[in-house]
């Protein structure tokens, strides 16, 4: 290995400074985010599919179909961006207006631009008007997509949507592609090169998301931490509407708990509450730096618990596992819980675990050290020289599996970014998923990273051809 951290046999491979800087920029610079919001059956998912040029989003906004918000990679006119499909829910007049407004509210915080889809045939509804009022105050570029415009009469229907106060409606047909190119031209022109919302909010109190499945004790814990007993907490999620964030002092330090309004609103009996909870959870995680995922220790781990944990890891946020209702856990349950953790959460052994009771206050003070540990790991950077020395020793002791009769080698390694720690490996061949997991384990053993996901990106380089004779 040379003084600059590269390995001596690297000269035979196509790897220059531009390769490294381009890879770092691609990994560390999050693309801008475009959120697609609107009522059920207005064509949101059809529009997303049209933007992507492939059929990926679920297109059935029918009763009983609920799902999470989903993000997709997209590109238009050379501009890469992420499309957030806010999905569908169970349509019901009782909760519809609130749910559409909820989409708009989350999009305002988590997107760089918003496409608001309205059915031009139906016209503006009360739910559309409520969402439009929110979007007017967002300060974000908002594009009004008047969908289902297939003829000149439809153009007139689209023009009527000026009444929403969001500027000129863009008449489109998501089904047939009419007008979508013009809409995307306008959207891309308004986008920043790099997302201004991903990981935004540097400085000030560290941002914490308190998330978990419904009725796991989030409101009780928030009240316990804040000393605020204004909220009446029952066996169903809910209370009154509070400001979006809560500043809470713990151990003499201010913490910003994001999106606490979602914890203080009674949604347990509302139509579409599963969708509402999913949108709120995604929004809180996106706005946070670290997430406390609350799990009911008195009950078996559920698919919902694992889904929330996956959201945190996929978003690249620091993580603290808090097992609540510990006052209800007896010896038998502790034994079963340990087995469940070993079997179902084996990939999250790096997350600090705190056993608490929001009801009695048991061990809640231990959350602060766990949060600080997770955030310190999340912020960690490893020098390039130290990293390459580490990988050279690891590969010498345990080389990657042979593929196609050839032994892949790691030419160079660098940490592209922190928050979360993201590493780029330039190699001579593909590294199997199992070997990547091995490298992650060894990285954790050597450098810690307790409480933070880490990411490993592999870039395979081509060998240079024979040099031309002079």
Curated annotation (Swiss-Prot):
SUPFAM superfamilies in alphabetical order: P-loop containing nucleoside triphosphate hydrolases (SSF52540)
InterPro entries in alphabetical order: AAA+_ATPase (IPR003593), G_ENGA (IPR031166), GTP-bd (IPR006073), GTPase_Der (IPR016484), KH_dom-like (IPR032859), KH_dom-like_a/b (IPR015946), P-loop_NTPase (IPR027417), Small_GTP-bd (IPR005225)
UniProt GO molecular function: ATP hydrolysis activity; GTP binding; ribosome binding
A single GO BP: ribosome biogenesis
Gene3D superfamilies given in the database record: 3.30.300.20, P-loop containing nucleotide triphosphate hydrolases (3.40.50.300)
Keyword DNA repair belongs to the record: no
Residues binding GTP 2, per UniProt: 212-219, 259-263, 324-327
Sites where the protein binds GTP 1: 38-45, 85-89, 147-150
Domain EngA-type G positions: 32-195, 206-379
SMART domains according to UniProt: AAA
Pfam families reported in the protein's UniProt record: KH_dom-like (PF14714), MMR_HSR1 (PF01926)
UniProt KW keywords: GTP-binding, Nucleotide-binding, Repeat, Ribosome biogenesis
Assembly and oligomerization: Associates with the 50S ribosomal subunit.
Family: Belongs to the TRAFAC class TrmE-Era-EngA-EngB-Septin-like GTPase superfamily. EngA (Der) GTPase family.
Function: GTPase that plays an essential role in the late steps of ribosome biogenesis.
Name of the protein in its database record: GTPase Der
């Amino acid at each position: 290995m040379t003084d600059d951290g590269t390995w001596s046999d690297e000269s035979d491979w196509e790897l220059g400074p531009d390769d490294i800087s381009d890879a770092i920029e691609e990994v560390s610079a999050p693309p801008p985010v475009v959120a697609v919001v609107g009522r059920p059956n207005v064509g949101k998912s059809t529009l997303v599919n049209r933007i992507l040029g492939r059929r990926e989003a679920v297109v059935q906004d029918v009763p009983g179909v609920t799902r999470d918000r989903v993000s997709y990679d997209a590109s238009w006119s050379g501009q890469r961006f992420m499309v957030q499909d806010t999905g569908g829910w169970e349509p019901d007049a009782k909760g519809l207006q609130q749910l559409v407004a909820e989409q708009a509210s989350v999009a305002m915080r988590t997107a760089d631009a918003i496409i608001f889809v309205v059915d031009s045939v139906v016209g503006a509804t009360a739910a559309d008007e409520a969402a439009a009022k929110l979007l007017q105050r967002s300060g974000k570029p908002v594009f009004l997509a008047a969908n289902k415009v297939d003829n000149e009469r439809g153009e007139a229907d689209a023009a009527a949507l000026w009444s929403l106060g969001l500027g000129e409606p863009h008449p489109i047909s998501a089904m047939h592609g009419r007008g979508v190119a013009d809409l995307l031209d306008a959207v891309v022109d308004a986008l920043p090169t790099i997302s201004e919302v991903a990981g935004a909010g540097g400085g000030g109190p560290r941002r914490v998301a308190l998330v978990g499945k419904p009725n796991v004790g989030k409101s009780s814990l928030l009240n316990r931490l804040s000393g605020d007993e204004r909220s009446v907490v029952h066996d169903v999620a809910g209370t009154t509407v509070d400001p979006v964030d809560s500043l809470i002092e713990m151990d003499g330090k201010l913490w910003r708990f994001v999106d606490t309004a979602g914890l203080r609103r009674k949604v347990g009996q509302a139509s579409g509450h599963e969708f509402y909870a999913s949108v709120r959870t995604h929004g809180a995680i996106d706005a946070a730096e670290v997430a406390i995922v609350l799990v009911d220790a008195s009950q078996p781990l559920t698919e919902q618990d694992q889904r929330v944990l996956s959201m945190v890891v996929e978003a690249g946020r620091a993580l603290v596992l808090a097992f609540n209702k510990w006052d209800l856990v007896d010896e038998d349950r502790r034994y079963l819980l340990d087995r469940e953790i070993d079997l179902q959460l084996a990939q999250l052994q790096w997350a600090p675990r705190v056993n608490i009771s929001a009801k009695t206050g048991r061990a809640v003070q231990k959350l602060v050290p766990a949060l600080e540990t997770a955030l310190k790991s999340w912020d960690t950077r490893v020098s390039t020289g130290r990293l390459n020395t580490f990988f050279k020793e690891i590969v010498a002791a345990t080389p990657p599996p042979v593929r196609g009769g050839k032994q892949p080698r790691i030419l160079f390694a660098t940490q592209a970014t922190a928050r979360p720690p993201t590493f780029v490996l330039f190699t001579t061949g593909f590294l199997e998923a199992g070997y990547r997991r091995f490298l992650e384990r060894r990285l954790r053993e050597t450098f810690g990273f307790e409480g933070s996901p880490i990411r490993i990106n592999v870039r395979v380089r081509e060998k240079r051809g024979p040099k031309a004779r002079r």
